[in-house]
Structures are given as structure tokens and as C-alpha cells.
Amino acid sequence: ANVRSKNVGTITLETDAIMLAEAVVVAEAPQVQVVEDTLMYSSSAYRTPEGAMLEELVKKLPGAEIDDDGNVTINGKELKKIMVDGKEFFGGDIKTGLKNLPVDIIDKLKTYDKKSDLARITGIDDGEEETVLDLTIKKGMNKGWFGNADVAYGTEDRYMARMMVNYIVDKTQFSLIGSANNVNDQGFSGGGGGPRWRRNNGLVATKTLGANFATETSKLELDGSVRYDYKGADIISTNSSERFLQNGSSYSNSNAVNKNKNSDVFANFRLEWKPDSMTNIIFRPNFSYGKTNGTSGSESGTFNSDPYSLIANPNDFLDFDKLEDDPLENIRVNATNDASLTKSKSISTSATLQLNRKLNNRGRNITFRGRFSYGDNDNDQYRQSETRYYQILNALGGDSVLYRNQYITTPTNNYNYSAQVTYSEPIARATFLQFSYQFQYKYSESDKTTFDMLDYPEWDINGPLPSGYESHAVDSLGKYAEYRYYNHDASVSLRFIREKYQLSAGMSFQPQHSVLSYKRGDY
């Protein structure tokens, strides 16, 4: 008992381990993180259906809302662009990104206020920020080729097909998207100068094909996109209504068929060149072309008593070609049959050039910005209608009839340009005196002419215009407008830029001048 230690030699122990089947550590990914002025969302924290697009994920983000037109707001701020790994995706187009970027490739989402090109380059905040959604691609999917495709077919010949192919290596990105469906899924933003239709109206078929690229070197950044969109909408509507008047009720019934086709081509590019450490040049050209064809036909009638008290379906007796045995003859007030055709073509182009030269490394710099845009639209409408007034007799004692046969053309064009020079001088630490001058000019012109085609009873709105129609212009229906706008803006401001706040004080001088020339009819 008094022995403090004793050497017993080497003791060998046999192995008797138990192998566990598995060990699982479960943790919930944080839904949102705040880093300075950036909100960061983890894609894995939100459940979405397999094969879902970005739109489904954005709907689940806290504070995010998507309206019926596809506009996105996050915490009350409207989203202006979608970016992929810091680069604009299809020019930053919101709806194209929402409909074509699969959730499976997204690791994180960041929302922040992106500074303007001028603020980013000069380091002097000009207050022109835009809220963007920047997506980070998952590791393993940001190198080489990857893509996805979905195809579906259902009853009544409903179909949907969508594909996306991506190539990412180093600082180069390339994306190819394509889709087609007739299930009212628009899949793109639309554009051009023709009429627009809401995505839930009628039977809508859409097709889109586009390519997006981005690449950069130490001195040059280049990105752009080209996209073709097609949208066809067939809308058939039937309406019955009753109006309550002081002396009784008025009843109206109508049928309408509308078919519209719209094709658009968009091209957006951005070039940023840094020939040396003190010079930066940014050039952004854009182009779009749109073409629209629309046909519509309608039949309507007004009655002084309820037509349903006489027949089961009064809408079957609105077409003038079906009134030989008219069961509603005694209660008719008036009726109209109308057919129209609309054609339009639009082209628009714009370009922005910014040149910045740093004069030292303390914030002294001079910047030139120039912008030009041009738009041209040709809109033609052909209309034929016949209105019968059953309670107003003509000179022969029969029903009065009003015929309309018109060709309406409305060409419009506009252009504007601006030039701005800005000089910044550092006068203290993070304090700048800024001088700026800008000149802006806008011009627009519209000339509406209506031609009476009643002297051409054989003319069909789907055929070519008859010879000599130009002499049948109706002066009283003509409209002409021309607008010119001139603006000068000279300003001086003092900017204080601190880590937690910014302060700007200044004054500006803005002489403006505008001229409007308007002519309607013969006046």
C-alpha cells in the first residue's frame, strides 16, 4: 500500500470498435443576412419545385413582391436589373432573367443599390443608384458547359418547351436561351412600338430565342445580348349587360374576336475600355425593332327590352348576315358590325458615351457624357363598319344606316440628344467641389391622316390600297403635332463623403424653352 508506482510492463488491448451506420449533422441555412447595405439570401434556404425558374424563388424571398406585369420590388424598392456573377444578364432585363434562369444553378442572391457608371469610376456619389439582384452561380457550375431543358405536352394541344445552355470559364460567360409555349406563360419582357396585351387575356402563344455574352481582360470589358420575341394572342369574348335608366332599362349584347401578332428584336451592348490607369471610356449602344399585326371583328346590338325573354341566346342574332328571320326585330334600337386591321412597325436606337480622365489620384477628374436616341413608328389602321338605327327612319321610310370605311395612318418620330461636362476638384479629405453643365434637346412629331374609302366599295381591308386614295383625305379628322424642347443645366455643388453619411449642397441654373405646334382639322 506504501508503493507509489510499479512497472507492470506492456499491456496489449484487443480492438472492440463499433462502426456507426452514419452520422448526420442537421442545420438550417440562414434565410437572409445583412452585410452593410447588401441583403444576401441563400438559395438552399427556400424550397422550390424541381425545375423551377428564378421567379419561383424570388416570390419566396422576404420582402419581395412580383406584380401581374412581372415588375419586382424588394423591401419597397423596384428592381432595375438582374446580374449573374456581377455581369448584366440580357442587359439586366428583369423578366427574361425571372423566366429563364433555373434555381438549380443559383447559390446565393444579393440585392444592393448599384452606383452609376460616373459614381463608380470617380468615387463621387451622384445619387443615381439602381437596385439590382446579383446571382452567384454554384461552385462546379461556373466552369465549362452546363444547361437544362424542359418539355411538356398536354390536352388540347397545349405545349411548353424551354432550354438554356451556359458556358463559363475564367472571366467569360455565354448563355443561349430558347422557349415556346401556348399556355399563357410570356417568358420575356416584350417591347417594340405596337399595342401590348396582358399575359392572361385569351389564348397566348409565345416564342423567344436569345444569346447573352460577357468577357473581360485587364483593360477591356465587353458584354451584350441579342433577343427575338414573338407573341400571338387570340381573344374571343361575349358580353351581355343591362343599364338602368330613369325611364327603364337598356340592354346590350356583343361578340368580339381579336387576333394579334407581335414580333420584336432587341440588341444591347456595353463596352468599357481602360487604356491606362487614368482614363476610362464606356459606350452603350442599344437597338430594337418591332412589328405588329392585329385583326378584330365585333358585332353588337342594343335593345329596349330584355332579349333573353324572347330567345335563349340573343348573341346568335348580332351578325347582319343572319337576320333574314329576326326574332328580335321589334325590340332593336341599334346594331353595329365592325371589322378592323392594324399594322405597325417601329424602330428605335440609342447610344451613350462616357469619357472620364483622372487628373490626379486625390479625386480631381473631368468627365464627358453624351447620349443620343432616335425612334420611328408607322401605324396604319383600316376600319369598315355598318351601324343600323332601327328607330330613326331615313328619307325612304327605312332604317337609317351609317357606313364607315376608313384608312388611318399615324407616322411618328422622335429624337433627342444631350451632352454633359463635369469637373470635380478635391478641396479637403473626402470633400469635393463639383462643376457641371448639360445641354439637352428633344424633338417629336406626329401626323395623323384619315382617308374616306366609301368611294371604293369593292376595297377589302386585307388587300392593297386602291389607286388614287390619297385624294380622299378628310381634313377635319387630321391631327398634326410637333414638339421641341431645349434645356440648359449649369450647377455647382459641394459634396462631403463620409463612411456613414453623405452630404451635398449646391445650386443650379436651368433655363428651359419649349415649342409646341398643333393643328387639328382645318385649323
Where would I find each of the regions flagged by the language model?
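Short, acidic, small-residue-rich periplasmic hinge/interaction motif at the N-terminus
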Residues: 2-47, 55, 67-69, 75-79, ...
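Short flexible coil/turn linkers enriched for glycine and charged/polar residues
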Residues: 17, 66, 103, 141-143
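Short, polar/charged loop or turn motifs at beta-strand boundaries
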Residues: 38-61, 69, 73-74, 84-89, ...
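Amphipathic alpha-helical transducer elements in NTP-driven molecular machines
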Residues: 51, 55, 103, 159, ...
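Extracytoplasmic beta-strand/coil segments of soluble accessory domains associated
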Residues: 55-90, 107-108, 118-127, 133-138
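Short acidic/polar hinge/loop motifs at secondary-structure boundaries
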Residues: 88-115, 162, 170-175
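Primarily recognizes Gram-negative and organellar outer-membrane beta-barrels
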Residues: 92, 115-157, 171-523
